[in-house]
Regions:
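Glycine-rich FAD pyrophosphate-binding loop
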Residues: 16-36
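N-terminal Rossmann-like FAD-binding beta1-loop-alpha1 element of flavoenzymes
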Residues: 1-23
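Dinucleotide-binding Rossmann-like beta1-alpha1 core, especially the glycine-rich loop
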Residues: 40-120
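Helical element adjacent to the flavin cofactor pocket in flavoenzyme catalytic cores
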Residues: 135-172, 179, 183
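C-terminal catalytic lobe of FAD-dependent flavoproteins
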Residues: 272-349
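Short hydrophobic core segments
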Residues: 2, 176-187, 321
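Short beta-strand to alpha-helix junction loop
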Residues: 53-59, 89-98, 136-155, 253-257, ...
């Protein structure tokens, strides 16, 4: 295994359970996008007409999360799930029209979302802004604590006999292994020539609720302010607020402008958020593919790719692990077919 984020650790764990001897190579495990992620499991809320394959892959992974998460919680003692349900809100008529379009499209794909009126929104989430006019409820979605997930996966890997090597790999072909899985996030593009994965920077804030301040929403809240997407994810005694999107190479510095926009946009959705403590600002690099689908599958006799998960790495963790182990066993997973590397043309080994 090359890469020790949520994707790499989940593959290592499942492969070890399947009888493989597994070694994870990563100089700084879980220090990348997995550490900064919001932890949303929200394929329906993030769905958009035309991205049918993205929706289907995400929904297939969401369906695996209850059993996957429960098994990890039992093995590790960590508490993973932080909230259940997602609410996407509309502040103006254009946003409300978009929500209705998405709800209709999602229904056509065989999934159900519920439109909530202004009064229903206020009753369900009283801390939200009173001028929110419509919302889309995805009751089957959840959110997990990404850092607890990393800790749980690490514990599960150790218990399953996975070994760890704190070194970077520059040539997958040089590893003395029967099979090599490349799951190194944005670094994957340096390990396999022509791999169409690019870094997209995302900044997030972690806020703590102070005494006497209105409580956080009980579910993930998503919206758009001045054309910028923003989300609020319940996390312990506070919230995770995210996330900016910038294509700026390998830059992971948090900017003043990014923090300003996140706070302003979050406060538009939840006015009392201005009274929360600003606990942490962080940035990571999403490994994006050209079509927003991950890249999962074999590219040579020895190398399997598991990368390009973009903003959905945590969501797609269980499906990716199952798909890679199936690939290693010579029986590719049908639910991951649309994520095959065969849809791209790039160099092989």
């Amino acid at each position: 295994m090359i890469g020790g984020g949520a994707i790499g650790l989940s593959i290592a764990w499942r492969a070890a359970q399947a009888g493989w001897s597994v070694t994870v190579h990563d100089p700084a495990p879980a220090s990348g996008a997995s550490w900064v992620a919001g932890g949303m499991l929200a394929p329906l809320s993030e769905g958009w007409p035309g991205e049918d394959a993205v929706l289907q892959v995400g929904a297939a992974s969401l369906a695996r999360w209850p059993d996957f998460g429960a098994e990890l919680e039992t093995l590790s003692g960590e508490t993973l799930f932080t909230s259940h349900g997602s609410l996407t809100v509309a502040l103006d008529a254009a946003d409300a029209a978009d929500l209705r379009t998405v709800a209709e499209w999602i229904a056509g794909q065989g999934y159900e979302l519920e439109l909530l009126s202004r009064a229903q929104i206020r009753a369900a989430q009283p801390s939200l802004a009173p001028n929110i006019r419509l919302a889309l409820l995805a009751a089957t979605e959840s959110a997990v604590d990404n850092r607890a997930l990393i800790a749980a996966l690490r514990s599960a890997c150790v218990a399953a006999g996975v070994e760890f090597v704190a070194e970077a790999v520059t040539d997958p072909g040089a590893l003395a292994a029967d099979q090599v899985v490349v799951s190194a996030g944005t670094a994957s593009a340096r390990l396999w020539p022509g791999l169409p994965v690019r870094p997209v920077k995302g900044e997030i804030l972690r806020l703590h609720r102070r005494p006497g301040v209105a409580p956080a929403p009980t579910m993930t809240i998503r919206g758009s302010v001045h054309g910028r997407p923003v989300y609020l994810v319940p996390r312990g005694d506070g919230l995770v607020v995210g996330a900016t999107q910038h294509e700026s190479g390998e830059d992971t510095q948090v900017t003043v402008a990014g923090v300003r926009d996140l706070i302003a946009d979050a406060q538009t959705l939840m006015p009392s958020i201005g009274e929360y403590e600003l606990h942490e600002c962080a940035a990571g690099l999403r490994p994006m593919s050209p079509d927003n689908l991950p890249i999962i599958g074999r590219v040579s006799d020895r190398v399997v790719l598991a990368t390009g998960h973009g903003r959905n790495g945590v969501l797609l963790t269980p499906l990716t692990a199952d798909a890679v182990v199936a690939e290693l066993d010579g029986a590719p997973l049908a639910e991951a077919k649309s994520a095959s590397p065969e849809r791209f043309t790039f160099n092989d080994e």
